[in-house]
Structures are given as C-alpha cells and as structure tokens.
From Swiss-Prot:
This is Asparagine--tRNA ligase. GO terms for molecular function: asparagine-tRNA ligase activity; ATP binding; nucleic acid binding. The gene is asnS. GO terms for cellular component: cytoplasm. Pfam families: tRNA-synt_2 (PF00152), tRNA_anti-codon (PF01336). One of its GO terms (biological process) is asparaginyl-tRNA aminoacylation. It catalyses: tRNA(Asn) + L-asparagine + ATP = L-asparaginyl-tRNA(Asn) + AMP + diphosphate + H(+). Its main location: cytoplasm. InterPro entries: Aa-tRNA-synt_II, aa-tRNA-synth_II, aa-tRNA-synth_II/BPL/LPL, Asn-tRNA-ligase, Asp/Asn-tRNA-synth_IIb, NA-bd_OB-fold, NA-bd_OB_tRNA.
Length: 463
C-alpha cells in the first residue's frame, strides 16, 4: 500500500484507494459497534477521519489505546463520507499504535489552550492547530524567499555565525569564548588575555551578515544571506528575541531606488506565495487570530508602496491630530507609534521612508550631498511598523573612513571592509528583514515567541 500525506489525501484522494496513513490522534469518538478517530500528520490543518469497525482484530484493545496524542499507522481504503464536514474518510483494515499518550498526563486535550500555557510546553505545542499553521506558513515564507532570489539570479551565501565585527555598532553582543570562566587569564592591566582564547581575539555571535555579504557582492554582484543572528538585548517584550533569522540581500551596481524596488517586490512575492500555498492556514488565522490578516495581505500585494523622505514624514507627524507618547522632532528616530501612524492611519498601506539623519544611522550608509542625511530606507507596514531596513552603502573610501572615525570605531578593525573601497569599488545597496517579524505580520500572531519553534529570550533557553 502507498503511504500518503493527509494534505494530499484531503485534496485529491478518491474512494476505493488503498493506502497507509501515519500520524497522531487528535480526537476519538466511540459509538455502538465502531469508533471514529481524527488523525493529523502535520501536513495540513485538516484531519483525516478514520472509521474503525468492531470486527477489526483486537478492536477493544486498540481503541482503548487511541487517546489524543497517540501515534498510529492505519492501513485502509478511502470511502465517501456519510457525515458532514469531510468529503472522504478512511475505513481501517489494520491499525498499529506506535506510542500511547496517557490522557491523565498528556497536556494537550480537546480544548483551546492559551498561548501562554503552550509556551510552557514548547516541545508539544507544534501539535496544536495554531502552531501547526504558524510553522507551515513559516516554511512557505522560507521557500518564497529562496524562490524570489534564485529566480533573479542571486547567489545564496553563508556568512559566519562567529564574528569579530559588530555590524550595527550597538554593542549588544553575545561573546564566544573557550576560556575557563573560573580562571580567566588576565593581562598586566587586568584585562582579559584574549591571546589565550581559541581565536586569540574577542569574538561574538553575529548580529548581521551584511558586511560579509558585501564582500561576496563585490565578486558575484547579487547575493543574499538567510540565517540566524543574535542580539544580547535584555528586552522581555512581545517584539524581541535573542536569536532570530535575518534575510539580507546585497546588490552591486545598485542605488537606493533599486533597493526600494527590490524590497517592495520581495514582500509582495512572499505574501502571494503564502496565500497560494497555505490558503487553509491563512483562513484559520483570519478566523481565530486576527480577522484582518487576509485584508492586510491583499493590501500589501495590490498597493504600490508610498515613498517619502524622513523630513517629509516628520512634517506629517508634526501636523498629525494625534497625541504621541514619544516626541517628534527632526533628528530623532521614528518610534513604532510614529511608523504605525504613517502606515495604518495616514496612508493605509506600506510606506518607505528615506534619507534619515546621518547621526541616527549606521556608519556604512551612503552620506548624501548635504552631509546631514544618509541614503537609508525603512519599509513601514500597517500593524507592525518597520519590517525592512536598508540603505545604499558608502562606496567612497575617504567618506567611509571619516564615518568610521566619527562613530568611535577603529579603521584597523575594518581593514578588510575598507579594502573593498580600495579595489574596484562600486555603488551598492542592500537591506535586512527580520524573518520572525515577517511571519508575525503575515499570521497576525501577537507575540514573536510564537512564530519560532524554540524562542530564545532573557532568562529562557529551553531545549
């Protein structure tokens, strides 16, 4: 017999097909002479109903084992369903129970559990409808990212997890060391003697693959990274993770206009792909989590993003008939409430803000001719605020050296990055997208800890 995934069976299975299904029991109902179980294998939101007649060998023993959470293999034949709610069902000819789940102790029963409770059983929460849908959408987003860039001739490059550089200059880094923490070697002035460490210098978990991606773009023109990044930011909020995934394309011979065009096309592609591949899951989110997710997706796909400068954005915010918690003034960074006002209330669609003050942006962003602003851009989305941050990079060696020094960094630490401007420099641009924030935005999930399988947050590193 053919082993089939339940998603495929529900989509195209026909009566009289003989097949094998493997999965986990979601529910059981016993009636006189037979039992119904609903089996799910993670491939779809929907379950496959299995009918077990009492003439099955060891019927009573098997049915007693088929509690919620038990793992099973069912051999049988598809038949047209007599009941409502499903087109077909599986008439069991043989049932094998791989593993039982004691109903007295198994924490997932047939009721809705709060997300707070499910975070306490992270090893089991993927078996619920909500988290099954989240991680199928997360998978579809991942596939869409690779599809988008590969179709456009980008090279996927693997940038290092362990690095000696702080791309953002924020200092919120996790240190990597093999030194004995009980007996840390010291220099004469009582600093840490890194010469005895594994890499003979201070090293950290990466906060971004951007600088290394720029290296590769100077050889392959268009590249992208997609991998984990780390921030030792002690923020216990619904928007922050210590370990999260980033998508970072870099394009040689590209300016800010090209960067914005790519970012807009990129977001539209991902939303289109998810709606095509996960319609059932997206409908679930729209009904159970946030009744605007489908409308939001259509908004992203069907609207041209609004583009305006930071200076114009500040003027609009100053005129707004809204009392903001944080001040609005030229030279201050936009807060989430400002970003959401622009995207949600004013323009009612995604907004790209460009040309931010140089003093609030990173050293590598291209200085504008006025020397007050840089060629930066942020994509602001309704309901979430900033979803993408990017810029045209500074390709002029003398200007970049000035910017490095102005931000208190040492040029010798970035000698290799400066070399890119010495040998065959070109205008280039790129952006970064926080993957979990994207999944959160698409699904409507309220807490970022619920869109990654194993969240890493302050005081929490389970599994």
């Amino acid at each position: 017999m053919v082993n089939r995934r339940i998603a495929e069976i529900l989509r195209s299975g026909q009566p009289d097909e003989s097949l094998v299904v493997q999965g986990w029991v979601r529910t059981k109902r016993e009636l006189k002479g037979f039992a119904f179980i609903e089996v799910n294998d993670g491939s779809s939101l929907g379950n496959l109903q299995v009918v077990i007649n009492q003439d099955l060998p060891d019927y009573a023993v098997i049915v007693k084992q088929l509690n919620t959470g038990a793992s099973v293999e069912v051999n049988g034949v598809l038949v047209a369903s007599q009941g409502k709610g499903q087109r077909i069902e599986l008439k069991a000819e043989a049932v094998k129970v791989y593993g039982e789940a004691d109903p007295e102790t198994y924490p997932l029963q047939k009721k809705r559990h709060s997300f707070e409770f499910l975070r306490t059983i992270g090893h089991l929460r993927s078996r619920t409808n909500s988290f099954g849908a989240v991680f199928r959408v997360r998978n579809a987003c991942s596939a869409a990212i690779h599809q988008f860039f590969q179709e456009r001739g980008f090279l996927w490059v693997h940038t290092p997890i362990i690095t000696a550089s702080d791309c953002e200059g924020a200092g919120e880094l996790f240190s990597v060391t093999s030194l004995d923490l009980k007996q840390i070697p010291r220099t004469e002035n009582q600093g840490i003697d890194y010469s005895q460490d594994f890499f003979a210098k201070p090293t950290y978990l990466t906060v971004s693959g951007q600088l290394e991606a720029e290296v590769m773009a100077m050889a392959f023109s268009n590249v992208y990274t997609f991998g984990p990044t780390f921030r030792a930011e002690n923020s216990n909020t619904s928007r922050h993770l210590a370990e999260f995934w980033m998508v970072e394309p870099e394009m040689a011979f590209c300016d800010l206009e090209g960067d914005m065009d790519l970012a807009e096309a990129f977001l539209k592609h991902i939303f289109n792909h998810v709606l095509e591949k996960c319609p059932e899951d997206m409908e679930f989110f729209n009904q159970r989590i946030d009744n605007t997710v489908l409308a939001t997706a259509e908004n992203i796909i069907n609207n041209q993003f609004e583009r305006l400068t930071y200076t114009d954005a500040i003027k609009l915010l100053e005129k707004a008939d809204v009392k903001f918690e944080y001040p609005v003034s030229w030279g201050l960074d936009l807060q989430s409430e400002h970003e959401r006002y622009l995207a949600e209330q004013l323009f009612k669609k995604p907004v790209i803000v460009t040309d931010y003050p140089a003093q609030i942006k990173a050293f590598y962003m291209r200085l504008s001719d006025d020397e007050k602003t840089v060629r930066a851009m942020d994509v602001l989305a309704p309901k979430i605020g900033e979803i993408i941050g990017g810029s045209q990079r500074e390709e002029r060696l003398d200007v970049l050296e000035r910017r490095v020094l102005a931000q208190g960094m040492q040029p010798e630490d970035l000698w290799w990055y400066l070399d890119l401007r010495r040998y065959g420099t070109v205008p280039h641009a790129g952006f970064g997208l926080g993957f979990e924030r994207l999944v959160q935005f698409i699904t409507g999930m309220g807490n970022i800890r619920d869109v990654i399988p194993f969240p890493r947050t302050p005081q929490n590193a389970e599994f």
